[in-house]
Regions:
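Glycine-rich beta->alpha junctions and the first turn(s) of the following alpha-helix
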Residues: 201-286
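Amphipathic, well-ordered alpha-helical segments in soluble domains
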Residues: 27-30, 251-258, 284, 291, ...
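Generic structural signal for well-ordered, non-transmembrane alpha-helical segments
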Residues: 250, 279-286, 322, 326-333, ...
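A short core secondary-structure module
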Residues: 159-194
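C-terminal helix-coil-helix/basic helical segment that borders enzyme active sites and/or dimer interfaces
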Residues: 32-40, 264, 287-327, 340-348
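A generic N-terminal leader/anchor concept
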Residues: 1-79
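Glycine-rich flavin
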Residues: 44-54, 58-161
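Glycine-rich phosphate/cofactor-binding loops in nucleotide/flavin-utilizing enzymes
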Residues: 345-393
Length: 393
């Protein structure tokens, strides 16, 4: 059944951030068992998103006044990151898609007018799947004004995750004056062209991140979200990296769990070298888990939660988020190598899950500008005469 026709779940009006996190925790094993069935080019975890809808998780990032659980609000960052981690532990492709849904809901609640927020919140409550399609190549999206106040889209987006299944993508496009404008496109009313042959990836095959040609589609002025340039407003643009890092930590946890299961199954738990590797892997997993809590606490530190866009707070929040994504990337890469050595060639054969987990996490770790992110954290440390005991706390 298409996501856009799903009925609202009664659970979504009963949830709190704690119960939303608990729902994701409960779903993780089912997501993991189901993951192989959508792991093919052109696949999509349709059934899994039905489960998320039934659990109220598609509406959970909405404010409580809009019928959600408030999971997307600043004081609930740790519950949100934990929810993303649990979903990523179940299936990284589902985690990637859900993170995009969360991002879109946060963006329209932050930058939308009251009437727009109510309209798009109703769509989320009705089961529509949102996403964010920003990446583009040379033929990027342009907005052409029409005489009737509408706009015609020209151009394409690459990596349109959930293409063909996301019914409310949040897009960005260039206005004639060069401004970068957000919009939310109602895809149950008109369809773009999907280039499915574009998506032949190493991993994350089930995310259906096709190239999307939007040329010729028209939108109303009411579909525009916020002012030009709002999409890149800090700290939210770069600071949002903590969300995908949380999903990545979940993927690392899945690899850890499967490694210990495999070693128990083959009777290698007494091997001193396996124990040493598991000790190293435990250290890495704990590091990722501690960083999730640290990231949430940093966002809520005095002043930053109430005045996040003040330059002094925004700059620090972005630098800390860049630290987190860098640490998580490093620990995941190290953990992947340790897991490979633990399970050997035998463990990398299907139907063991390591081959899929390795592909998915390796691919998902390739986020934009990793070197620049770490360099920015170093720049921040050099630009501010703050002692180490206060710099990142």
């Amino acid at each position: 059944m298409p996501t856009s026709t799903l009925a609202a779940s009664p659970k979504q009006r009963q949830q709190t951030p704690v119960t939303a996190e608990a729902a994701a925790l409960a779903l993780a094993p089912r997501l993991f068992q189901q993951a192989p069935y959508s792991d093919y080019e052109g696949g999509f975890p349709t059934e899994e998103f039905e489960w998320l809808r039934e659990a109220g998780l598609l509406a959970a990032p909405l404010a409580t006044t809009l019928g959600g659980s408030g999971l997307g609000e600043a004081e609930q960052v740790y519950a949100l990151l934990s929810t993303l981690r649990h979903i990523g532990r179940g299936n990284l492709a589902v985690g990637r898609l859900y993170e995009g849904h969360v991002n879109a809901l946060q963006l329209f609640q932050r930058f939308g007018r009251p009437d727009q927020i109510s309209h798009w919140a109703a769509d989320a409550l009705a089961g529509h799947l949102f996403g964010v399609w920003n990446t583009e190549a040379e033929d990027g999206v342009r907005l052409e004004p029409l005489p009737n106040g509408r706009f015609r889209l020209q151009g394409s987006k690459t990596f349109g995750s959930g293409a063909g299944h996301v019914t409310r993508p949040l897009l960005t496009g260039a206005l004639p004056d060069g401004g970068w404008q957000m919009l939310i496109l109602p895809l149950d009313l008109q369809q773009p062209e999907y280039n499915t042959s574009f998506w032949q990836p190493l991993g994350m095959r089930a995310s259906a991140s096709f190239q999307v040609n939007l040329s010729g589609l028209e939108i109303e002025a009411t579909d525009l979200l916020g002012k030009p340039g709002d999409y890149y407003q800090q700290p939210w643009f770069s600071g949002g990296a903590i969300r995908f890092a949380a999903v990545q930590v979940g993927g690392a946890e899945a690899i850890f769990d499967e490694t210990t299961r495999f070693l128990r199954a083959v009777g290698r738990t007494d091997d001193p070298y396996q124990r040493q590797r598991l000790g190293e892997m435990s250290m890495l997993i704990a590091t990722g888990q501690h960083w999730l809590r640290a990231a949430a606490e940093f966002v809520k530190r005095p002043g930053a939660a109430t005045s996040p866009t003040l330059p002094s707070y925004a700059e620090a929040t972005v630098a800390h988020a860049n630290l987190m994504r860098s640490v998580v990337e490093d620990l995941c890469l190290r953990l992947l190598a340790l897991a490979e050595r633990c399970v050997g060639a035998r463990g990398l054969l299907r139907p063991e899950p390591f081959e899929r987990l390795h592909r998915d996490l390796t691919h998902y770790l390739r986020q934009p500008a990793p070197d620049a992110a770490l360099a920015d954290a170093g720049r921040y440390a050099l630009a501010h005469d703050i002692p180490a005991h206060r710099l990142w706390t």
